[in-house]
Amino acid sequence: MNGLIPTQNNDALAGVRNLFRHLMDAHVVEALYVPLETENSVITPALVTDPVYLERANPFAPAMPINGARAVAEITGKHAPAQIGVVLRSCELRALMDLIKLQQSSLEQLVLIGVDCPGTYEWAEYNRLQRDGGLSLDDYLAAGSRGENLASPALRVACQMCNQPVPEPADIRLHIFGADLSQGIPITVEDGIASILELEPVEVSGADGRQAVVDRVIAQRDQVRQREFAAMRQRLDAKDGFAEIFSTCIRCHNCKTACPICYCKTCLFCTASFDHEPEHYITTARRKGAMRMLSDTLLFHLTRLNHMSLSCVSCGMCTTACPAEIPVGMVFSVIGADVQAAFEYRPGRDLSEPLPLVTFQADEWEEVGEKRK
């Protein structure tokens, strides 16, 4: 059902906070996972059970501390302990879908609330804009509704080239693209939830222009995506390109921690398997003439690529987390896109679509061997 959240004095944030309170008051959800804004304007994800805290909810803030799929997987496990609503961006929803396929989360007792995403800033830039008074949420939403500046260099690179900015699938979708937010916030609500909330269908003025704005945003970002991919492929194709890109890796494993798909409770690279004896280093250095330090960094990233590339949603959180400013996310996005194309798979597209590596088709990959008669 299509509806409209009324706004107070053109305040979209107040309108969406009222919706969240309504969801809790009507017992559609018992708890809500949503970004909260502290008194110092810091955005932090939180699981809210007391509606009082929803006065701080800000799902529109252009900041992304974590990919929320990680938190949702922790909150729900295989069986959510309560009816929980989760407010997520598109890349977070898509990551969650693949985590569900990997049996790390469940849709049981989960209400998915998706928000159109005009893009987010790196933390340092977001904090600077907040501190200097250069970030107006109203202006940000207005630009998003018109589809303007959504490939701006000020945004995170992952957002500049994101060509899937609309949250799907979701039980409730909050529309920004193409919306006249002075009228209210257009929403799409699953019929059962709409009935509980006693919402009435509303014909939204200008709704026909939404798809045009979405198409324009995707076209802008596809241009950035093609340019960035071409530059990264050139670096990867160069002699020792992969090793050169990761040459400054300090083996902190931040990228692993930030990745929503990297879910192993005990990572091989955090075990004693890679705690080498001192003799190992001198022996290896003598054999090769020189040994890269810290050791095993390339093996770490190659292993993650092998595990993650099919489900990489290009959220870019690994790049954000890297203290050495290595473009980890760009490497994974480029290689992930090639792997996903080879298997005709797109992460998060369809929950019923199985992960390629857990399926078998007798007639696939015939080019790597002779077809049996």
PLM-predicted stretches and their roles:
Residues 221-247, 264-373:
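Ferredoxin-type iron-sulfur electron-transfer modules in oxidoreductases and energy-metabolism complexes
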Residues 89-94, 154-167, 247-268, 309-325:
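Local cysteine-cluster metal-coordination motifs and their immediate loop/turn environment
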Residues 14-19, 44-46, 207-213, 260, ...:
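Short charge-dense sequence patches
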